[in-house]
Structure formats: C-alpha cells, structure tokens
Amino acid sequence: MDHDLLPLRGRPKKLDRNLILHSALMEYWSKGPSNVSINDICKLTGASKPGIYREFKSDDGLKKSALKIYKTLAVQPLLNILYSDQPIYKTIDDTISFITQDRKTSGIPNGCLLVMMAALSEQLGCSTLKELNKIRADIYAAFFHCVERSKLENGFLGMETDVAAYFLENQHIGAMRMQKEGISNETIAKVLSFSFKMVFQKNSNQYN
C-alpha cells in the first residue's frame, strides 16, 4: 500500500485565525451580530466548528476577538483624530470626514458594529460586553479630551465637559444609525456640522 495515500492522523489542520476573524467581523458588521452563528462562519470559511471552538473557546470569544479587530480598523483612526494636537476646527473637519467617508471605496459595511452590539447588549456574552464597554469608554474619553482642548483655545460654548462629551458621542452614534439606514453621507455631514456648531462656537464660521 502506498503510505503517501493514507489519511492524515494526529492534530487537525491549522485553522486560519485571520480568515476566521475577518469573515466574522464583516458578517457581524453587515448583518448584525445576532444574525450570524458559528455555523455560518464555518460555511463561509470552510473551518470546522470544533476548530473554531478550540481557537476562540466560544461564540462569546469569537465576538470579542472580532470586536478587537473592529477597534483597530474603525475606532482607532477616530481616536487618533480626536487626540491630535491640530487646531480644534481641523479636528472637527477631520472627524466629520472620517465618519462620513465612502465605505464602498474602503470595502467596509455602512453603520457601526458598536452601535449594533450596544442595542443587543443583553444578548452578548460577558467578555464581548466587557470589550464593548471598554471601547465605548475610550471613545467618550477621546471626545472629553477634545472638548477640554477646545477650552484652551477659547473655542467652547461653555457646556460642562462631560455633558458635551456625551452629546458628541451620541452625535457619532446617531450618524452611524443614519448611515446604516441609507441616508446620504452629504446629509449626515450637514447634520454633524450643525451639531458641532452647538458646542464649538468659535468654529461655527468654519461650517457655513
């Protein structure tokens, strides 16, 4: 018997972790995390269900890992803008441009995975929920920093910093919901510009 033709035994073929994470992320992002199962990921990638469980331990583990990738791809660039030391009006312009970028050109879905997960927080596992809350706290902290910096430039309306930070964070959330609903980026940009005028008074003439 030709031993080269014998079926392989021992440890299973190594799972492509990056493929699994990318596929899971895009499915969660485009369809919603509650509408995608591990079976769906298996069919999409050709991976075995036991293999995915060995790698990620659970559906919760897979979602948490995908969420970390999402932060790197879609959240960290926003944080970098908000923490930049450029003039505040430029920070606002860049923030609006980032939020309303053409997703088709970048090959990513419309909307925000964080917003979708937050709406389903009661259905999330403990580790995914913990990661979600951490990322949301990071976004709030970045807006808080941006507001504090604007005060140093005398470009702030006078609202309490924490209130303004929550307001701006929720403008971001609202913009993502509008985008998911198919509202044009041009319209969303106008809404955001109007909202930012309410907070950053000094820069209101930048958006006329």
Which stretches of residues belong to each language-model region?
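Short coil/turn segments at alpha/beta junctions that flank glycine-rich nucleotide-binding fingerprints
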Residues: 31-34, 110, 153
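N-terminal intrinsically disordered/low-complexity leader segments
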Residues: 1-15, 203-208
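Helix-turn-helix
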Residues: 2-8, 19, 23, 27-61, ...
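Hydrophobic alpha-helical bundle segments that form small-molecule/ligand-binding pockets
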Residues: 124-126, 136-164, 199-207
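Hydrophobic alpha-helical segments that form the core
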Residues: 110, 115, 119, 158-178, ...
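Alpha-helical structural segments
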Residues: 15-26, 30, 44, 61-84, ...
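Amphipathic alpha-helical segments used for helix-helix packing
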Residues: 91, 105-127
